[in-house]
Amino acid sequence: MQKYIGVKRIEARPMTRGDYNTYRGWQIPADENPADEGYLVKYRDGYESWSPKEVFEEAYVVEDDFPLLATVFNMKSPDYKRRFEAEYCQLKIRYEGLKRMCEKWDAGELDFTPTCPRATYDKQMAAMVDYLSVLEVRVHYEDIDLQE
């Protein structure tokens, strides 16, 4: 079988199975535990469903907690400007993360010991800054609106 990765943007809030049945106006089936933890899930088209907590939390993360993951929607866009935006945002997120790590390293606040010499990370950051600069020039020439 072919493997798939599901990518969809949803809204959700915690809700027990019993509360979901009440919300829908349904009688709770005798073989279901109304105390089961889960989530009320609302899809883009307005469809609503309930998902058990474990299943939901394995499949979804809070968008604001993983900004890199949110760029996937632009990565698969047919519009090259949206794909460009994804490329730019991914690079910027990674650069800012590496920069924060190096700042913590300099302050003696890292909770791990890096395996590469500091100069390697400095070189990587310099390359990332150069790459970002080239992309920013393209933004100007290609009239791309970065919706950061």
Task: Name the predicted role of every residue range.
Residues 110, 137-148:
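Long amphipathic alpha-helical coiled-coil segments
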Residues 40, 50, 110-111, 120-121:
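Alpha-helical interaction segments
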Residues 65-66, 95, 143:
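Generic N-terminal initiation segments characterized by hydrophobic and/or small/turn-forming residues
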Residues 94-117:
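Short E/K-rich amphipathic alpha-helical oligomerization segments
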Residues 90-97, 138:
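Polytopic transmembrane helical bundles with strong interfacial aromatic enrichment
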Residues 61-62, 107, 144:
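Sparse recognition of residues in long alpha-helices and their boundaries
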Residues 112-138:
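Short, charge-rich amphipathic interface segments used for partner binding and complex assembly
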